[in-house]
Amino acid sequence: MIHPTAIVHPSARIDSTANIGPYVVIDEHVELGPGCQVGPHAYLTGHTTIGANNVIHAGAVIGNVPQDLKYRGAPSRLRIGQGNVFREQVTVHCANDLEEDTVIGDGSLFMANVHIAHNVHIGNNVILANGVLLAGHVTLQDRVFLSGHCLVHQFVRIGKLAMMQGGSKVSKDVPPFTIVRDTNIICGLNVIGMRRHGYDSAARLELRKVYHELFRSKKKLDAALATARDLYHGEGAQLMIDFVASTKRGVCADVGKGSVDDESQALE
């Protein structure tokens, strides 16, 4: 159903099961999949493809041009998967050129006033709380959780099941399974998240050992990575080791204060 006050370009591809609310504007090159709901005053624009069962709340702007001085008007793209929720005033921008799309996977929640800039890649089942700001070219792997008003610098990668505490900021990569506080500081492992998503006690203990080798052993990173590769071979361990080894920006540091990593939790 399309509300009579909505303005939908005749060339936009809107599935017949989508529900378009009052005063929505949908531009020419938008494709909106089955079961989507678009709330009042939302604006869908750009070369934007939105999959099934997404919910877009009031005032969200999806697919606008990037805030990048290098952008020269190319018909760059935004691709959104299925089952995501975009709350009030969320903004998501298309890529800044034709070489790469802005991409959002499936099943994520973006709370009010989140900003997702050009060329960002977001995996599945991600949660961004109110006011999170992602700069251009950021990558979030699956099941990342960023608390309210976190700031992520351009080109930063945040690994699987990582978390950021409210108001924290990063300009370096965040390894999988870790928790960020303050600015570029990690303070242990997301043990509860690992447990909830199938990492048994043996896997959690191995990850704790990898974490200590990489971030608390006082070794140079290359030496710590070599030791970790020799000793630890589980799926989670390899994910963390490979992520850290591939960094181009450096990774956040553990400075040994305010740790939330607890041995008893890791062994449960």
Q: Where are the regions that the model predicts?
A:
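Terminal amphipathic alpha-helical/low-complexity segments used for targeting or macromolecular assembly
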Residues: M1-T5, P10-S11, S16, N53, ...
